[in-house]
């Protein structure tokens, strides 16, 4: 038997080819579609979604803040009336991947097979992390969409210029997570000065998406900012409470709370949870949101 010096393995790891971003994204999209196919056979919606929920998942829960961890996320889902029967199926229409191939996002359209007919047609946004066992959802949002025809054709992918090897260094990842949170705060701070419309234009990528209204997704800065009035004063602020970021430092997600600038006197205003997917072209470039 041949014996290999430990340095051999270190050199081999260092010289291994970087992952192909397109191949990595194709694997993520395949996983998203496979979870949907599996969900179609489930006894209820929560059971169908459960296999893809990550152990460290953080999911916004309106009126309650956040469900943190897989068990809490599934418990919050079981409280949703429309999730108690039938099943969910979905189709992604866009995906994005980090340069190291360890994190990504998808968004698309979801349909419930039971429950209130007016609430069955939905849309979703998912942020994914790659685990040894496969892709899992770390942040997730779905909402009822407005009536209307939508295209389910795949959009152009969100890809880095090139792939890089993942870095297994907690300090590096922590620094990237902190930078994502800092970008979110700077976004909110800027909105206090120039208003929401201008801040959303300044801090978004040209292909940014907003899912909060309409039958489909608002894609592109003109569509994202269409609902904001020019010069309208900012009445809200927001910040990050949880975040994930790829070791390549080019993709991350911030999860936090939107609060009123004039909170209620009795303290009943708990704010509204949100999450934002951020991308930058390189670790020395500014973060810009790409999906929310």
Could you describe each region identified by the protein language model?
Residues 1-9:
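Sec-dependent signal peptide recognition
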Residues 14-51, 138, 144-202:
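Short, low-complexity N-terminal intrinsically disordered segments enriched in polar/charged residues
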Residues 23-26, 45-99, 117-119, 197-244, ...:
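A solvent-exposed, acidic/Ser-Thr-rich amphipathic alpha-helical stretch
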Residues 35-36, 90, 103-107, 125-128, ...:
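Short, structured motif recognition centered on aromatic/hydrophobic residues
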Residues 55-58, 107-113, 209, 255-261:
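Generic short beta-strand segments
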Residues 64-67, 111-113, 143-147, 215-218, ...:
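Solvent-exposed loop/turn segments at secondary-structure junctions
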Residues 115-117, 151, 264-269:
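A short acidic/glycine-rich loop-to-helix N-cap element
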Residues 121-156, 271-292:
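Short beta-strand edge/turn micro-motifs at domain boundaries
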């Amino acid at each position: 038997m041949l014996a290999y010096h430990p340095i051999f393995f270190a050199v081999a790891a260092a010289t291994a080819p970087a992952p192909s971003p397109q191949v990595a994204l194709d694997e993520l999209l395949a996983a998203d579609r496979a979870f949907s196919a599996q969900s179609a056979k489930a006894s209820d919606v929560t059971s169908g979604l459960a296999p893809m929920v990550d152990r460290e998942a953080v999911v916004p829960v309106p009126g309650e803040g956040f469900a943190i961890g897989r068990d809490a996320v599934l418990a919050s889902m079981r409280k949703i009336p429309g999730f108690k029967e039938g099943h969910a199926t979905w189709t992604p229409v866009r995906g994005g991947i980090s340069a190291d191939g360890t994190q990504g996002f998808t968004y698309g359209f979801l349909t419930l097979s039971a429950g209130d007919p007016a609430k069955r047609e939905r849309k979703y946004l998912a942020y994914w992390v790659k685990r040894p066992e496969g892709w899992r959802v770390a942040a997730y949002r779905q909402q009822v969409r407005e009536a209307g025809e939508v295209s389910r054709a795949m959009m152009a992918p969100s890809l880095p210029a090139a792939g890089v090897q993942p870095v297994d260094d907690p300090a590096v990842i922590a620094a990237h997570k902190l930078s994502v949170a800092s970008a979110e705060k700077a976004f909110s701070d800027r909105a206090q000065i120039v208003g929401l419309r201008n801040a959303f234009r300044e801090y978004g990528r040209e292909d940014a998406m907003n899912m909060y209204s309409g039958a489909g997704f608002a894609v592109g800065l003109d569509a994202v900012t269409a609902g904001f009035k020019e010069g309208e004063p900012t009445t809200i602020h927001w910040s990050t409470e949880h975040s994930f970021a790829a070791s390549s430092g080019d993709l991350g997600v911030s999860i936090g709370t939107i609060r009123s600038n004039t909170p209620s006197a009795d303290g009943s205003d708990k704010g509204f949870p949100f999450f934002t997917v951020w991308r930058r072209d390189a670790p020395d470039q500014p973060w810009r949101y790409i999906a929310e």
